[in-house]
């Protein structure tokens, strides 16, 4: 009996080993990676959209670069989970990965996979992987979003165009964690993003504990090549873990996935969460852009499939049942390579019970300020009616805090409201409060916040004052905010170039002359007649001309004021229509969600369900810009600018030259006549 058990154990251990699939940057020999990241996707509320940017160029044509950014496994089938909420992607990717022979490593898509949702920016990623032996899977916890399907596999032939693309969503537990294997040093990375990014390395650890190493934060603002510091991070510290007391539901077991991944030295930008951990919040409040270290999550002993299916649900259970949980600290187990990642520290309600690591110590006043801001920003819990799925109820209680998505053309993530006051604080607080009311009323659509933060597809024009700007998160530094692209930017007040030489600018309501003189026909005739009187006529003509100039300036002033008022009105209208479009999409997604059990909205309404709310914000903004440019085109002074022959003095000069030529011709003719008469006489 013992021999049989030993033989079975050897077979199981031998089956865990895989082929070498990754190559370390500072080592010429491939490394055997046989550890498996055990993670599950409990339900659709546990994932959200995250855009990312590869370090280096957007097209990774190097085999080594491609192998560093994608994990490949042999014999791992694609896993699909239901995803019904829908998401509007911001940055998406067309992927083409082949082996050295040119054979595609991506699977053919199922027949029921459609392109969904829409995307703002598309990057094309190409490359080869000499170590791949099968299909290509993305990072553990990462999924490509199609129509109502979130798949771990990027399918072959799904090359999308602008406005119709698959998105990438990632598990909240690891959306800011980058995995590395046996850290052998750092590589120089050419940054393609202006926001902070995250990289990971095991530092001095000789054995990778779990699926990720120490997390560092770096700031990049000038697209320059940076090499992270090689200072070894402090040893990992034990962190408390809250164990849930509830059991998984049928829905969680249905949506459980356990994709495998092996990815080394992958760099991403814009990682963050609306439910940041305590040490991340402390570093975000300081806003100094300094390097912060995140200790690796301890690796508990492998448990039953039930335990593996519950690891992502720790935060929800810890949020709703704090009084029924037991907090125990478990040290890391470096000898084991399998990690069950817990999300107990991602809940804001647990911040008071956790302590920050020593290396992330900040000013106590700053920490207390951050804690107060988080307490005041979190709305009160709303009592929900009992539902059929208790897991959904727990997840909705965990997503009540109003969050915003950090703006980036290549990424998007949820962060806490900023605690640093600025010129737009009141507008930000007002909009977030309005969204907070929406969250308390809806309380079941945690992913609709991405639609609220949908970027307006135009850039702020120069010479504008942005009074409604929701741009950066609390984790971004001041220098970083200056370079980050805004998430919502509405220009509501126009400030044109002013010139001290103009009498009336038309910028304000009362800077134009109220008396606009309209000359009558008799006055015109009288002025024309009096102008012929010697000595007296030129004076009358001068007064008449001065009156015309004053009237002209007043008309120009009023036209400029009208243009400014029109531009402001259009901008206000653009803001209203943009918000109406956003909330219309939110309502449509909510209706689709409610009618899912009956086959969706199109099943109920038929062909009438097809709607297309076109986003014309760019066209309207272009018209506003054109109005402002036309309004700024003005000519002042006596026409001394430009080329001399086209100016007023140039015209007078040309007339003088013509007069001199005429006089010269007359003199020449007179001389010719005299000479001719002299010879005849």
Curated annotation (Swiss-Prot):
Low complexity composition-biased segments: 304-313, 335-347, 415-424
Compositionally skewed regions (Polar residues) per UniProt: 246-260, 278-290, 314-330, 348-371, 389-414
Keyword Repeat among record annotations: no
Modifications after synthesis and translation: N-glycosylated. O-glycosylated in the mucin-like region.
Sequence ranges on the Cytoplasmic membrane side: 670-681
Residue intervals annotated with topology Extracellular: 19-648
Lipid-carrying residues in chain (S-palmitoyl cysteine): 671, 673
Positions bearing carbohydrate: 94, 171, 190, 202, 207, 219, 223, 255, 310, 313, 326, 337, 344-345, 350, 360, 397, 408, 422, 487, 564, 619
UniProt site (Cleavage): 435-436
Membrane spanning stretches: 649-669
Free-text function comment from the UniProt entry: GP1 is responsible for binding to the receptor(s) on target cells. Interacts with CD209/DC-SIGN and CLEC4M/DC-SIGNR which act as cofactors for virus entry into the host cell. Binding to CD209 and CLEC4M, which are respectively found on dendritic cells (DCs), and on endothelial cells of liver sinusoids and lymph node sinuses, facilitate infection of macrophages and endothelial cells. These interactions not only facilitate virus cell entry, but also allow capture of viral particles by DCs and subsequent transmission to susceptible cells without DCs infection (trans infection). GP2 acts as a class I viral fusion protein. Under the current model, the protein has at least 3 conformational states: pre-fusion native state, pre-hairpin intermediate state, and post-fusion hairpin state. During viral and target cell membrane fusion, the coiled coil regions (heptad repeats) assume a trimer-of-hairpins structure, positioning the fusion peptide in close proximity to the C-terminal region of the ectodomain. The formation of this structure appears to drive apposition and subsequent fusion of viral and target cell membranes.
Assembly and binders: Homotrimer; each monomer consists of a GP1 and a GP2 subunit linked by disulfide bonds. The resulting peplomers (GP1,2) protrude from the virus surface as spikes. GP1,2 interacts with human CD209 and CLEC4M (collectively referred to as DC-SIGN(R)). Asialoglycoprotein receptor (ASGP-R) may be a liver-specific receptor for GP1,2. Members of the Tyro3 receptor tyrosine kinase family may be cell entry factors interacting with GP1,2.
UniProt-recorded name of the protein: Envelope glycoprotein
Native organism taxonomy: Viruses, Riboviria, Orthornavirae, Negarnaviricota, Haploviricotina
Gene: GP
